[in-house]
Structure formats: structure tokens, C-alpha cells
Amino acid sequence: MIFELVSSAAVGGVVFLSKMHQKGATNDASKIQRICANCGLKVKEGKETRTIQLLRKTRNDWGVEYAYRIPLGLSFSDFEQKIQHLEDGLNHKSKVYDFKLQDFKSLRLRKDILKQIQNIINKKKLVRKEIELSYDGLLKIRVYEKGIPDFVKFKEDMIKQCRGWEVPIGYTRDGLIKHDFDQLSHMISAGMTDMGKSNVLKLIITSLVRNQSENIKLFLVDLKGGLSFNRYRFLNQVESIAKNPEEALETLRELQDKLNARNEYLLEKGYEDIKEAGDPVRYFVIVDEAADIAPYQECQDIIVDIGRRGRAAGFRLIYATQYPTNSAMPSQLRQNIGARVCFRLQTEAGSRAVLDEGGAESLPNIKGRAIYQTNEKKVVQTVYIDNKQIDNIIKPHINIKARKEYENAKVSNEGSPNGKYTLELEETRLS
């Protein structure tokens, strides 16, 4: 009797799945064709209307890849512009039911089989599909059933996975993405306020201090008053923090002098670059906010010079801004920077100023979601590191003497009326 009930329930589950498939809940291939047609991705040839034609469907662990032939008259960029329409269309009701036969392979013929089926249904309610497009003569549409995580908390093991001048950036569906500053020396980071730009700068600095404490020299330019980099000010690795345009110019002039000296040394010794010379030291120049430095032409000229000549001499430039424009990021600078971490931006024009193409304006409104662009483009969820984690990592590298001087000055200031310093006269042998 129990076996008959259990068997009936199992058959019922399979019948339910079959009906859902007939309703089109799992038939993404036909959905994609309908979405494309409804979005205008079709051409007229005489009396016939042609749209994409499915040639191949390949199932993988991460989801399904569909290969389509594009009708003559349409380009890959036409489909790229409709990526959000495709993703939203595929998720129409997919949050409710999205079953496949293998989902039911885990069923066991036990008394609780109805509960097992219900658990499968409940889990499938949480699914949101994400897609990627590529083109190699055929339009490839990858439909991912497992999305990029919406939040990734920093763990020190992420830094331990990095070698040399690698730093953790974020996660894709496939795992951790790292950036190697010895492979791609310079980076642009851009994004709207509170989307994660400052956090990724702190993640990079903290990772480098932890892994390359003996070999890194940091020159920080923060034209928002120095607050972004305030907790790093007493690090042994920090050479200077510029908090206004005047200090920035002084720092950049000093850096240009160092750059000239190192290049002269390499020329004199016959070395091609700093790696051949066996010099492990790297000079990191981190600028936040680029738009505020743009009006100062000499500052801009030196930054462009560091981007152009700095790689061989061991200089690394990270250039960050909330307001990407062609004036804040001149083409001479962009041409020499091979890596971009771009968070959500308001306009396609802003995205083009950073990535040389649109896309950042279409990122979901998720804090930390970014496009990591090198020779290819990946959407990542950047790693979030909180201030307590930063302090724990950098604490061994703080200059104790400088910290004590700061704390003593703070106590003296707090002990004076109205928070002002008082004049103290001491009797000496000359008085």
C-alpha cells in the first residue's frame, strides 16, 4: 500500500514536470527566438521575415549554450544591445518554476516523497538565470542557471591564493578572479558613488601590503581630503598621501624624478626592464579622485607620463574616478592602461570613457558588481573587505613611532580648552 502511494506520488511529480515543460517554462530556446523577434531582431527578405535559427544546444554543468545563425543584415552588436531584454524575458516566471528531469533524479521512494518534491519546487523558486553573449561566426548565448553571487565577504585565504603581484578582485560563476600587476601594470577603476570603487582600492592596497610588504612603495593621492586612505597613513610602505592639488603636484613631481632616475639606471646597465635588473621594488601610484585632478594640467601630464613610461621602471598606476569623462581620462592615458574595473555608471557615455564601449550603464544595481576588462570582459562581484579586517592585516606594518606621535598630539589637543593647543613656557638655563 505504501509503495503504491509513493509510486503514485513519484509519477505525479513527473507528470507535473511534463505539463510545465509543455507550457514553455523550461524551453529557453524557443523563448530566446520569440524575445529576439519581439525586440526587432529580424529582417525582411521579400515576403519572408527571418530571425535567428537554432543550430545547436549544449548542456553543461553551469547551464545551456545555444548556438544560432544570425540572418544577413544583423550584427552581433545588435544582440548585445538587447541583452537585458533577453535576460528579463528568460526570467519571466522562471523564478516560480524551472525544472529539469535531473532535478527529480534525487527522489527516493520513501514516505516523505511529497516533501522531497516540495523541496525541489521551493529551491527552484530562487533561480534567476543570467546570460552571456559571444560570436565566432555563430551567435552563442550561454544561459547560466547559477548566477554570480550578490555579495562576497573577504577571507584572508583569498590573498593567500595570490602569487607575486597578484591581488584578488572578485568572483565570477567559475571562482576567484585575480589581477597580476606584473602582467598588466596599470588599472582604471570607475563607478558611481557607493557602488564599490573605494572598497576595491582598499582591497588592492591591503593585499599588496600583506603579500609584498618589503617590496612595495605607496604614493596615495586622495583629493577628497585624504579620508579614503586615512587608515594607511602610518604604514611603513606609504611614502606620501596627497590631500589637495598642491600636495598632489609635489608628489607627482617627486615620482617623475624617481621615474627618470630609474630609467637612466636601466639604460646605463643595459637592462630592458626592472624585472631583468632583478629589482623587486614596485612604486604604486594610486589616484582617487581623477576628476578633481583633471583641471591641473601639469598633474595630468605627469600621470600620462607614468602610464606611458612607468611599466619598465616598476611604476604601477591605479587611476580611479566617480565621474569618468574624456577630460578626466584622456585618450593618451587610456591607451596605456590595460585593465579596468568598472562599476555601474549612469550613462553609456561614461561607460565608453572607461571601457571604450557601453555596458557599465546596464549593470544591475548591486553594490560591488563590476566589469573587469583586460583582453576580455568579465562581470564579477568584487570582494568586500571591512575596516576591521583591513586593520588586522596592516597592523604589523604600522610605524609605531608615528602612531605614538599622533596619539600624543590627539591627547594634548583633547586636553586643551575648546580643543585648541595651549602655550606652555618652560624655564631654561638661558631664561
Regions found by a protein language model. Name each.
Residues 52-56, 175-177, 274:
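Short beta-strand/turn micro-motifs at beta-sheet edges
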Residues 22-160:
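N-terminal "pre-motor" subdomain/linker immediately upstream of P-loop NTPase catalytic cores
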Residues 1-24, 62-65, 71, 147-267, ...:
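P-loop NTPase catalytic phosphate-binding loop
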Residues 95-98, 262-271:
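Active-site phosphate-binding and catalytic loops of NTP-dependent enzymes
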Residues 129-130, 274-275, 359-363, 370-371:
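Short proline/glycine-enriched turn/loop segments at secondary-structure junctions
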Residues 140-142, 286, 371:
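Soluble periplasmic/extracytoplasmic beta-strand elements of cell-envelope proteins
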Residues 268-284:
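Mid-core helix/loop region of P-loop NTP-binding domains shared across ATPases and GTPases
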